[in-house]
Amino acid sequence: MAQLGAVVAVAASFFCASLFSAVHKIEEGHIGVYYRGGALLTSTSGPGFHLMLPFITSYKSVQTTLQTDEVKNVPCGTSGGVMIYFDRIEVVNFLVPHAVYDIVKNYTADYDKALIFNKIHHELNQFCSVHTLQEVYIELFDQIDENLKLALQQDLTSMAPGLVIQAVRVTKPNIPEAIRRNYELMESEKTKLLIAAQKQKVVEKEAETERKKALIEAEKVAQVAEITFGQKVMEKETEKRISEIEDAAFLAREKAKADAECYTAMKIAEANKLKLTPEYLQLMKYKAIASNSKIYFGKDIPNMFMDSAGGVGKQFEGLADKLSFVLEDEPMEADSEN
């Protein structure tokens, strides 16, 4: 009875161990591949719990999401014979799920060592061997990342389709201490040169600013002077216009005054001409004789009145004609002057 219990206990333990080894879990973002007797099985499994034959079947979980492989301490010899070391090179990649079986079959589950690590060493050594230390360390360093990515992806497209390189990051290489100090000194001098150049640019900028300020100030003064000059010109033109208006008004007044005087003289002349009749002249003669205080005696006194009446009348008529002619000519001359 005791032996039976021992057998049952051993059988139960074996069953539990078999069950425990048969059940396995695949994490999200991974694909499970299976080996039986060392041979890779064609079947794969996704995330979750799965069963397999215990003891004779084993599995490996292959990541299909983005992962970063680090390649450390990669030696590299330049074309000048200087040995440098890259401390760390990071390769970001991912595996397409449907390509897991083919890649694991051809390159094992540790495919990254064969496809990525070895390729990084090879490409870096080829790059360094055709470039100088100056080019690798400074001039072409920014191109190493992209060149490595393109070279890796080109080979993987033909050798392992489904393995995609997302990015490559390369750290600054370690160079011999003496050379590094020279580069640091060179960078220091270059920095000083850049600082001096920037100071010169600042001085030039300040001078340019001062020049622009002076130019703006001169333009402002010129504009003010131009405006002032324009105001003075306008004032002079206004004064000239006012003077012309006053002169025109004065000339009009004088002309009107002269016309009035001429008209008055003409009317007086016409009135005088109308008065110079023989009867009026005879009357004026009698008044003149009557007002004369001297008295003449003699026999010719009556004849004097008779004979002289005609002569005096003719004289007064001639005088009136001359006066009328002169008065008529004066308006014409005044009109011609106007």
From Swiss-Prot:
GO CC annotations, alphabetized: endoplasmic reticulum membrane
Annotated glycan sites: N106
Keyword Transmembrane attributed: yes
Residues on Cytoplasmic side: 1-3
InterPro entries hit by this protein: Band_7 (IPR001107), Band_7/SPFH_dom_sf (IPR036013), Erlin1/2 (IPR033294)
Pfam family for this entry, one: Band_7
Residues modified as N6-acetyllysine: K267
Keywords of the record: Acetylation, Cholesterol metabolism, Endoplasmic reticulum, Glycoprotein, Lipid metabolism, Membrane, Signal-anchor, Steroid metabolism, Sterol metabolism, Transmembrane, Transmembrane helix
PTM statement from Swiss-Prot or TrEMBL: Deubiquitinated by USP25; leading to stabilization.
Main location, first listed in the record: endoplasmic reticulum
GO MF annotation list: cholesterol binding; ubiquitin protein ligase binding
Compartment list: Endoplasmic reticulum membrane
Residue ranges annotated as Lumenal topological domain: 25-338
UniProt-annotated stretches for the region Interaction with ERLIN1: 177-309
Membrane-crossing segments per the record: 4-24
Gene3D superfamilies with a match to the protein in the record: Band 7 domain
UniProt entry tagged with the keyword Kinase: no
Subunit-structure text: Forms a heteromeric complex with ERLIN1. In complex with ERLIN1, interacts with RNF170. Interacts with activated ITPR1, independently of the degree of ITPR1 polyubiquitination. Interacts with SCAP, INSIG1, SREBF1 and SREBF2 under cholesterol sufficiency conditions; indicative for an association with the SCAP-SREBP-INSIG complex. Probably part of an AMFR/gp78 and INSIG1-containing ubiquitin ligase complex involved in ERAD of HMGCR. Interacts with TMUB1; TMUB1 bridges the association with AMFR. Interacts with SYVN1 and RNF139. Interacts with TMEM259. Interacts with TMEM41B.
Reported function: Component of the ERLIN1/ERLIN2 complex which mediates the endoplasmic reticulum-associated degradation (ERAD) of inositol 1,4,5-trisphosphate receptors (IP3Rs) such as ITPR1. Promotes sterol-accelerated ERAD of HMGCR probably implicating an AMFR/gp78-containing ubiquitin ligase complex. Involved in regulation of cellular cholesterol homeostasis by regulation the SREBP signaling pathway. May promote ER retention of the SCAP-SREBF complex.
Family listed: Belongs to the band 7/mec-2 family.
Protein name: Erlin-2
High-level lineage: Eukaryota, Metazoa, Chordata, Craniata, Vertebrata
Gene field: ERLIN2
